[in-house]
């Protein structure tokens, strides 16, 4: 059963894949998987009532086994939107990672200083602000700025997740953030557009003009239109994403 706790997996959501291949590339010593999630299990860490999707369960033990199989030494476990601001599943993974994981949380403005400190003690080092409309409900920007100012003294960073088409609207907010800023998935570029076109040029300017902004080069499987080798025998894989990376 892919999802426990009386939850039903959203139609079309992938099941857990039990047979991943081992990479031919040997990762360097200290390699970190900079973006991964744990989902539930639903019978232990229920999914949020306001979630936009229900995934298959993907526990911390499955994550750690995959980490070792792929050759990573550490993980950055990012709070999944299906858990809302209930960070228990993510924190549980950090506490059982034997010092090999850090976390990125989702919090609301009413979180206490004590609870922020407890997240820090567990290994959380950032918060995620999600602007992908199909995944989350709107949060007022003044609330997010308040959160950013509260986590700054802890030395945390802010992770931002957005669609490339929304960058012009979000520019002033992003550039006002007082912390280090980490962009998820290269700002989700539309890879059917020219890499030297105006949309990606704006993202490049966002990066170059703001030294506190960094980007994760991640998630080609969500960005690609052409698909990986397994889908169309393209060599190398993700040929439409590579120019943007």
Task: Please report, for each region that a protein language model flagged, where it lies by residue.
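N-terminal export leaders
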Residues: 1-3
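Mid-domain alpha/beta scaffold segments of enzyme catalytic cores
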Residues: 6-154
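H/E-rich (His + Asp/Glu) clusters that bind or coordinate divalent metals
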Residues: 7-21, 191-245
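Short, surface-exposed alpha-helical recognition segments that flank or form part
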Residues: 54-55, 78-81, 161, 229, ...
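Divalent metal-binding pocket/active-site signature
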Residues: 57, 108-110, 117-118, 122-206, ...
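Aromatic/hydrophobic pocket-lining residues that form the small-molecule binding cavity
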Residues: 60-63, 87, 112, 144, ...
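N-terminal cationic-hydrophobic initiation segments that often serve targeting/anchoring roles
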Residues: 67, 94, 98, 174, ...
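Structural detector of well-ordered beta-strand residues that form the stable sheet scaffold
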Residues: 76, 102-104, 159, 182, ...
């Amino acid at each position: 059963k892919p999802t426990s706790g009386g939850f039903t997996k959203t139609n079309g959501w992938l099941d857990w894949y039990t047979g991943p291949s081992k990479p031919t590339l040997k990762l360097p010593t200290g390699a970190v998987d900079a973006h991964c999630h744990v989902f539930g299990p639903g019978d232990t860490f229920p999914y949020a009532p306001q979630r936009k999707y229900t995934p298959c369960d993907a526990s911390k033990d499955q994550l750690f086994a995959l980490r070792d199989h792929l050759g990573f030494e550490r993980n950055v476990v990012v709070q999944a939107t299906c858990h809302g601001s209930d960070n228990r599943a993510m924190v549980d993974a950090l506490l059982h990672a034997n010092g090999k994981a850090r976390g990125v949380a989702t919090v609301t403005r009413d979180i206490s200083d004590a609870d922020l400190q407890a997240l820090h003690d567990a290994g959380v080092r950032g918060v995620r602000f999600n602007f992908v409309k199909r995944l989350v409900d709107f949060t007022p920007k003044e609330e997010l700025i308040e959160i950013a100012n509260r986590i700054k003294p802890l030395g945390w960073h802010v992770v931002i997740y957005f669609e490339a088409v929304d960058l012009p609207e979000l520019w002033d907010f992003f550039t006002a953030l007082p912390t280090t800023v980490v962009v998820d998935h290269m700002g989700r570029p539309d890879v059917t557009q020219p890499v030297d076109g105006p949309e990606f040029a704006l993202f490049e300017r966002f990066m170059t003009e703001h030294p506190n902004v960094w980007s994760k080069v991640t998630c080609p499987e969500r960005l690609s239109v052409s698909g990986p080798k397994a889908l169309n025998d393209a060599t190398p894989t993700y040929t439409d994403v590579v120019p943007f990376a």
